[in-house]
Amino acid sequence: MAAAAARWNHVWVGTETGILKGVNLQRKQAANFTAGGQPRREEAVSALCWGTGGETQMLVGCADRTVKHFSTEDGIFQGQRHCPGGEGMFRGLAQADGTLITCVDSGILRVWHDKDKDTSSDPLLELRVGPGVCRMRQDPAHPHVVATGGKENALKIWDLQGSEEPVFRAKNVRNDWLDLRVPIWDQDIQFLPGSQKLVTCTGYHQVRVYDPASPQRRPVLETTYGEYPLTAMTLTPGGNSVIVGNTHGQLAEIDLRQGRLLGCLKGLAGSVRGLQCHPSKPLLASCGLDRVLRIHRIQNPRGLEHKVYLKSQLNCLLLSGRDNWEDEPQEPQEPNKVPLEDTETDELWASLEAAAKRKLSGLEQPQGALQTRRRKKKRPGSTSP
């Protein structure tokens, strides 16, 4: 049933335990998908992206450097490719013109033949984008253009069909009022639709807008939110504002035209790892270390629409962009079918049952001793009535 209903899932979430979770918000159901049966932490999901076929195909980037192809129509994994090179986890994943684009922590960006299953083949292109990468983001309007940034690694824009040098390299802001250098820590990047501008959020709670068409390479707009590192960011449907999340579970909407705070969203209890707005509906999906997927309404009245506890720490998510969320057909339920137990809770229930049996066997002896003591009190000759 999970495979048959996979196409109707609204949100896909990658977990720290290596499980891909599909969540249907209308039915309030979550299904687990794994390539090898049992989940392994060595296969923790660190990146997700849609394939070139739209939302029928998904690419799943894992900690063991494999990129798995998942069919959302059939609910099954359809192969994988090992992408070696560099160190660390995937910080970005993309697909363009039959090629696969990967980028890891150590700053190695590689382009691969997407259909090539030979793991020993060399990449088509390799770029060194600088160490400490936190995010690689593809330009939706130009799939061969990507942006990178990280800790002490300033924002850069790369044309994968051009030279091996960045087409834009951001310049750090001027020294602060103490004439001290301002550190760099770009955590997330987004391309603004209909323009060449980009927006970044930083580990020092800054939101910055860059314009490569401008003569200056410094930000054309900068604002701050809160006191804690910003970890994730997404564009709102209109493209005039962004929603950012930080390490304390705080969410806020920032206007990119004036740099002011438009409002906040409540409910999160842990560091935010993934954010995505629906392209046409006023909905925001968020996930993080508190293991809960939340769907907020971002237009007045703001508030929490859905909340699903998913048992594992959540690293990333993809939100379906379809509009017919409420129009999906109701598939018939199979009679007398026993649901499969969740692999994440098998060991927990087994340990609880064993503990209960030990406790029950230990209680049998004290109960017998208690009855003996009560009988002794009622022997003949006792002064008790």
Curated annotation (Swiss-Prot):
Q: Name one GO cellular component term.
A: nucleolus
Does the record carry Nucleus as a key word?
A: yes
> What subcellular locations does the record give?
Nucleus, Nucleolus; Nucleus
Q: Which residues carry this modification: N6-methyllysine?
A: 311
Tell me where in this chain the PTM Phosphoserine is found: 214, 361
The Basic residues compositionally biased stretches are 372-385
Which CDD domains does the entry link to?
A: WDR74
Q: Where is this region: Disordered?
A: 323-345, 360-385
Q: Which UniProt keywords apply?
A: Methylation, Nucleus, Phosphoprotein, Repeat, WD repeat
Q: Spans of the WD repeats?
A: 40-80, 83-122, 128-168, 179-220, 224-266, 267-306
**Does the keyword ATP-binding feature in the UniProt annotation?**
no
Record GO biological process: blastocyst formation; ribosomal large subunit biogenesis; RNA metabolic process; rRNA processing
Top-level lineage group: Eukaryota
Q: Required for nucleolar and nuclear location: where is this region?
A: 320-385
Q: What is the effect of changing residue 185 to A?
A: Reduces interaction with NVL
Biological role stated in the UniProt entry: Regulatory protein of the MTREX-exosome complex involved in the synthesis of the 60S ribosomal subunit. Participates in an early cleavage of the pre-rRNA processing pathway in cooperation with NVL. Required for blastocyst formation, is necessary for RNA transcription, processing and/or stability during preimplantation development.
Assembly state and interactors?
A: Isoform 1 interacts (through WDR repeats) with NVL; the interaction is independent of RNA or pre-60S ribosome particles. Isoform 2 does not interact with NVL. Interacts with MTREX; the interaction dissociation in a late stage of rRNA synthesis is required for appropriate maturation of pre-60S particles and depends on the ATPase activity of NVL.
How is this protein named in the record? WD repeat-containing protein 74
Name of the gene this protein is made from? WDR74
